Amino acid sequence: MSQGTLFDKVWDLHTVDVLPSGQTQLFIGLHLIHEVTSPQAFTMLKDRGLNVLYPQRTVATVDHIVPTENQARPFADTLAEEMMQALEQSCQDHGITFHNIGSGKQGIVHVIAPEQGLTQPGMTIACGDSHTSTHGAFGAISFGIGTSQVRDVLASQTLALAKLKVRKVEVNGTLPAGVYAKDVILHIIRTLGVKGGVGYAYEFAGTTFEQMTMDERMTVCNMSIEGGARCGYVNPDTITFEYLKGREAAPKGADWDQAVAWWQSIRSDADAVYDDVVVFDAQDISPTVTWGITPGQGIGIDEAIPGLDHFTDADQPIASEAYKYMDLQPGQPIQGTKVDVCFIGSCTNGRISDLREAAQFAKGNQVAAGVKAFVVPGSEQVKQQAESEGLHHIFEQAGFEWREPGCSMCLAMNPDKLQGRQLSASSSNRNFKGRQGSASGRTLLMSPAMVVAAAIKGEVADVRQIPKASP
């Protein structure tokens, strides 16, 4: 059992009771909801005659089904419109804060909570979305939950959970040029596997993470779940505090000083005991691209697709399946693979720093003929900031479409979908079969900068070979 980790401290502080099952009844400090996993939960509350216990601890927005082109109401998709109306009514009925389209605060749930200062160190955070681990970048314990658990949080502000073990994932050194936070997490998942983190919370540590911005830390924590870890976090530090200071929901005045003192106290102790420790060298990480149908099937841009002998007996069947589905062969270089669609956005890489970096590679270049490329800001605030900096003009002049905020093609529960066998270069987080809207569509995951490189070349390309414009 680990001692002195942030995970242990936050877990213990939020423990209401230990249940006969051995699970912990855990108090949830912040509950985030959206239009997809909440309607049924509210219906279950109504059927049982229950109210939302602490409506002030729940914040809602719309993101999954939101169109990124024509957002006029009612939506053309009648089911999407019904889901929108259901969430609007539920929030009104229960007094829940709701950030709707046009409010200036709408966006992907895992983008808006941090940018508003709602996400803070030491919190327990739950959301009916598997990428809730994003918020761990602040030193919060955050995890995705199912619809019945959404109901439980609404009704009791608690969850019954089994405590996770803690694995320290340490990365040391300065990242090489052209290597980003997305490459770091893809490299970790490639090495530890998509099931390697099952039963664990990942504590991301080491000098590489100490140098990262909050946006970069969020990218890494976002994809903890792709590595099997339900929760991933980084200990809060001055970078965390500077990000939060002055944000709308962050503490102010004397409360701020008290908050920072407490946030520092929950950091993992120097002598904390972990259930496991793995160490990586930042210099071993290169621009990384997934080639298959799981986030663990990734390789460096200079590598070729591995043969079956590279995989364990247990992993060989899915590797064989990936070769066939992706129409790629062992020994084939990933560089030069033709792309049809290039997507920049999602809760993994739709923040302002992602767009700034991508724009520096797009500037002065042109999207290749036959390639559809588009950029979807993660929130209305991100969109407004990007436009104030003129980033939208850079993208549009390069041939990218500039869209409204939403989850977009990450999961294609909206009009943004692949068609047929199209192959997508995507800054999102999942590359499962059919993930981006077509049952036969194919997805390659990579950093936003690498997506721009692919868009310009019309094929998977090394961003290190693309000139970078001045900011």
Curated annotation (Swiss-Prot):
Keywords: 4Fe-4S, Amino-acid biosynthesis, Branched-chain amino acid biosynthesis, Iron, Iron-sulfur, Leucine biosynthesis, Lyase, Metal-binding. Binds 1 [4Fe-4S] cluster per subunit. GO terms for biological process: L-leucine biosynthetic process. Its EC number is 4.2.1.33. It comes from the Bacteria. SUPFAM superfamilies: Aconitase iron-sulfur domain. Pfam families: Aconitase (PF00330). InterPro entries: 3-IsopropMal_deHydase_lsu, Acnase/IPM_dHydase_lsu_aba_1/3, Acoase/IPM_deHydtase_lsu_aba, Aconitase_4Fe-4S_BS, Aconitase_4Fe-4S_dom, IPM_dehydratase_rel_enz, IPMI_cat. Its cofactor is [4Fe-4S] cluster. Gene3D superfamilies: Aconitase, domain 3 (3.30.499.10). The keyword Ribosomal protein does not apply. PROSITE patterns: ACONITASE_1, ACONITASE_2. Pathway: Amino-acid biosynthesis; L-leucine biosynthesis; L-leucine from 3-methyl-2-oxobutanoate: step 2/4. One of its GO terms (molecular function) is 4 iron, 4 sulfur cluster binding. The keyword Nuclease does not apply. It catalyses: (2R,3S)-3-isopropylmalate = (2S)-2-isopropylmalate. [4Fe-4S] cluster binds at C347, C407, C410. Belongs to the aconitase/IPM isomerase family. LeuC type 1 subfamily. Heterodimer of LeuC and LeuD. Catalyzes the isomerization between 2-isopropylmalate and 3-isopropylmalate, via the formation of 2-isopropylmaleate. NCBIfam families: leuC, PRK05478.1, PRK12466.1. PANTHER family: 3-ISOPROPYLMALATE DEHYDRATASE, HOMOACONITASE, MITOCHONDRIAL-RELATED. This is 3-isopropylmalate dehydratase large subunit. It comes from Acaryochloris marina (strain MBIC 11017). The lineage of its organism: Bacteria, Bacillati, Cyanobacteriota, Cyanophyceae, Acaryochloridales. The gene is leuC.
